[in-house]
Amino acid sequence: MDHNVFSQFAYKHPGRINVARDVIAFDMMLDHSCLDIWGILQTPDWYPRFFRGLGSCEQVSGNAQEFEVRVSTPRGAVVVHEMRQTLRESSMLMWFHATQVSHCFVSIRLTPEEGGTRIAVRIFGVGLLHPDLAKTGDGAVRNWVREGLLRISDYLEGKQSSLLVNMGDGHSLLLSVAKTMLVSGVVRASRPDRGLRQLNSLAKWGFTLAGGLGAAAARSPHNIASVDRYGTSTYADVAERTACIASGLAAGGFTSDSTFAVLARNHAAMVECMVAASKLGADLVLLNTGLAARAIEEIIKHNAVDAIFVDDDLDPQVRYLPAEVPRISTHPNSILPQRGSIDDLISAGPGAPPVAPPRQPGKLIVLTSGTTGTPKGARRPTPPGFGAVAAMLSRMPLRRDEVMLLCAPLFHAWGLAALQVSTPLVATVVLMERFDAEECLKTVALQRCTVLILVPVMLQRILELPADVVGRYDTSSLRVVASSGSPISGASVIKFMDTFGDILYNFYGSTEVSWATVADPTDLRLAPTTAGRPPLGTRIAILGQDGNPLPVGAVGRIFVGNDMLFDGYTNAASPAVEDQLMDTGDLGYLDASGRLFIAGRDDEMIISGGENVFPRPVEEAIAALPQVADVAVVGVPDPEFGQRLAAFVVRAPAASLDEEMIKDYVRNRLSRFSIPRDVTFVDQLPRTATGKVLKRRLTDGQFPLETGWPG
């Protein structure tokens, strides 16, 4: 036992040491220098990268030698540890203890020896340091610490270990897919007749929107397929209407070689346009409703669009289109003069020959967010089978006959993915045209929704509602709330689950790679900022500049492999692909438990005074302040340091907050080079229609410093 350490602790904390308690003591050697190992051990927020089962580790107060660290646990509890560091000529010593309880203490001493470093670990009262350690024996605790220290060694050595593959139960991916389909109710062994009709439709139309809708209609024709402000439609209704729309389009001279576009909000008619184009085998461009008229003109021209479906109130955004591009109204009775509608196509459909299944499925073209410039058109692939559905269901427990409130825009990859998974589940999709936080909760209560699909900015708007407003609505029917599209702050994750229960799922992916990882409630309770783990049939790798995997814990480029990698852009070169893994353009790392964390976009990394700084940890730190409603951190030019950090902050209503308070708060939690030099208070941040912050707008010189962005 290290008696000097024991004596120091006993002197400072009299009465806390019970010598009769068990003590875990062991030494081990690592083939690395004391300074290299010490550099990691003195950085508490890195501990989850190497030690399994740890959530966030955040410094909350103190200085470089003595400070407090807050550690989250799987049950959401927080343990605060006091840490102290001592540097001597012959060794380096670190010790810490839980401040809320007595009789617990850990010391780690590093001593240089020939060929490496001897690490002496002494643990007193292990079960009081972390609640999960109380359930294990001394041998398991000793192995846990050893494994963590060995991962630090692997990190320093550069071991190529940042590669994750989810192949299910390990025996067969196909068997895992089949099991997932049975558990979710997509396939039922008890009704082979309905299953046969379902498979016949998929054989006819493929795993497309047309095939999914047709399979659901063949299996459960009288189930409600959609609900919007105009009414309800059964699966049989939608199948019949979309067949007529497709026939009407064919009668008008459109073919599988045609390309359509749709500019619409979430409603049943938009879904019908999408399914009808799928039945015809035509390509369909999903237009963001937030695009300017000139941008839409450019996209229509580039994609050689033959006709466009458009909501009447969005007509000003298509005013620059050539007259030879027909506009088809999505509204039953268009108020616009000489404007045909999808109801006109439905009326013409019964007299036209039915549309035969196309030889090749049409492509859905989804636009990227355009946060770094002009949106790119991404060709979405046709799912090769049930694997795409099984991937989502393997990490999110959706079941047959769900009632799904779809708030995420259908023109966005996330909204589209939710629609695609709804038909195998024969779910009822409730469509919200314009998002309003209170109206969302009201709809959940009225429709008894079991699933809510949204993007993070919508989740944030719900959290901003007063408690008495939230309390008016019974949301107990919700089992799953799924968010995707941009990061959610850790503070918002915890607040949402504390308010609505542990039902939050956070999807990470992109238009190009579809899904990559999913964080379930267990992940989020332990590590609120995690992007989660890969779903079934998915590979994740963190690669370095040489294209090889990096060690666990190291930040590198995130590459993803699955069955739904996109088929390329319509107007740009495709991202890099390494060994069937596609570059997401994001940087991140894997922790010891196999969870992914996003550091930021490759082009967001800030180099200040030679130090690499990512905005996300700084944003997370500032967002934890209750006086902060929203925040974005960017890099701006600096004549001395090359770049410096600038924070744009939205105050919470009636909050008192100034620049120095924010700097002091960050100073106590992150390294000195993570402190923003500039803090600007604004009314709101510029965002895309799906909620992503337009950071380039913050640095292009047109930002109004005093009044923020107009609402």
PLM feature segments, named:
Residues 224-267, 271, 275, 292-297:
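Conserved AMP-binding/adenylate-forming core of the ANL superfamily
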Residues 234-236, 363-387:
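Conserved AMP-binding A3 loop
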Residues 239-244, 378-399, 460, 464:
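Conserved structural elements of the adenylate-forming
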Residues 291, 308, 442-444, 452, ...:
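AMP-binding/adenylate-forming catalytic core of the ANL superfamily
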Residues 334, 343-367, 374, 396-403:
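Conserved pre-ATP/AMP-binding loop-to-beta segment of ANL
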Residues 386-403, 411-451, 465:
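Conserved AMP-binding/adenylation subdomain of ANL enzymes
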Residues 424, 450-453, 467-527, 539, ...:
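Gly/Ser/Thr-rich phosphate-binding loop
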Residues 534-537, 545-579, 611-613:
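Conserved ATP/PPi-binding loop(s) of AMP-dependent carboxylate-activating enzymes
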